[in-house]
Amino acid sequence: MNAIDGTSRQLKDTEDQTLDDTPSLLSIIIDAHVPSWEEIKSQISISEAVASILVFINAHLALHNSNSVNVIGYNASGARILYPPKSGVESTRSKEREERSESVSDGEQAPSKKDHSMYRQFKTVDEVVQTELWNMLNHTNYVEEEKQHNSAISGALSLALGFINKHVFVDESRMRARILLLTVGHKNETIQYIPTMNCIFAAQKLKIPVDVCKLGPGSDQVFLQQACDSTHGIYMDISEKNSKTPKGLVQYLLSGFISDPSLRPHIVLPTQSNVDFRAACFLTKQVVDIGYVCSVCLCIMSQIPSNRRCPTCDTTYSEKTLAGLGRKPLKKKKKKVVKP
């Protein structure tokens, strides 16, 4: 448990705060990029990770009878909602189960089920999530995924925010919302820096915490760290370099991410000691230390555009302005001190 102990965070004075019994909407985003999972298959497989996520979902639903969940999968081909299913699918399946149970006449024994003792809501979520996720994986062009090596993480965040906006803010339901992103870490995720940051700003405005659980040995994702920091979420890197093993994913999920946002001021949570706040270049999509900023739209560039136009607002820069940017800073000559 020392791996998730946030000793750097001090407990806040919350004596005047009162807890309420408000239900919570949890939107879980699952990375379904198969080539990335193949790189860490010796540590954990995608089926094992999904099993841990389902245990976490059931624990969330068990905390409050009005809690709800939304599951989204994404890969290089795009993002799609896995749960809840399309309208009518879940209700039809529930009716079929009820009809089968009611069709048993008096004096007859009902047919035994493999998971008869399982809570119906847990069973429904487990079946739908697994079925929809495997359908998504089976209909994915893996040849194209190998070539692209990127993901639709911004599209998945947009789906999650849209679902939350519809079921929490538009319907005016008395419910809190948060997002949990399970990612393996892709080499070219910085390509989606701009649309992802737009989603982060939207979540920050709506006061929706974004939690990130990163698996694998890859480097930390800069914009995901920024997302957790700006939305008061939790960022946890589960990899061997941090003395953590993905084999214990269910333990990390239940220990670090199960707490409701209303309870987080009262407990010690995993913290980020070093957050990289550098931005990404709008041209090369790479993180930069020093760059140029457009005076019109604040676009960040690591190099001067060859066509002398801003890649975002299409503003044309004058040659005089660009010539001044290419010059090295002038050094003041030191005056010689003449000794008397």
UniProtKB/Swiss-Prot annotation:
Keyword list, A-Z: DNA damage, DNA repair, Metal-binding, Nucleus, Transcription, Transcription regulation, Zinc, Zinc-finger
GO CC terms of this entry: nucleotide-excision repair factor 3 complex; transcription factor TFIIH core complex; transcription factor TFIIH holo complex
Main subcellular location of this protein, as a coarse class: nucleus
InterPro entries: TFIIH_Tfb4/GTF2H3 (IPR004600), vWFA_dom_sf (IPR036465)
Keyword Transcription attributed: yes
Biased composition (Basic and acidic residues): 92-103
Residue ranges of the region described as Disordered: 85-117
Zinc finger (C4-type): 294-313
MF term (GO), any: zinc ion binding
Cellular location(s): Nucleus
Domain of life: Eukaryota
One GO BP annotation of this record: nucleotide-excision repair
Function: Component of the general transcription and DNA repair factor IIH (TFIIH) core complex, which is involved in general and transcription-coupled nucleotide excision repair (NER) of damaged DNA and, when complexed to TFIIK, in RNA transcription by RNA polymerase II. In NER, TFIIH acts by opening DNA around the lesion to allow the excision of the damaged oligonucleotide and its replacement by a new DNA fragment. In transcription, TFIIH has an essential role in transcription initiation.
Family under the similarity heading: Belongs to the TFB4 family.
Assembly information from the UniProt record: Component of the 7-subunit TFIIH core complex composed of XPB/SSL2, XPD/RAD3, SSL1, TFB1, TFB2, TFB4 and TFB5, which is active in NER. The core complex associates with the 3-subunit CTD-kinase module TFIIK composed of CCL1, KIN28 and TFB3 to form the 10-subunit holoenzyme (holo-TFIIH) active in transcription.
Stated name of the protein: General transcription and DNA repair factor IIH subunit TFB4
Native source organism of the sequence: Yarrowia lipolytica (strain CLIB 122 / E 150)
Gene behind this protein: TFB4
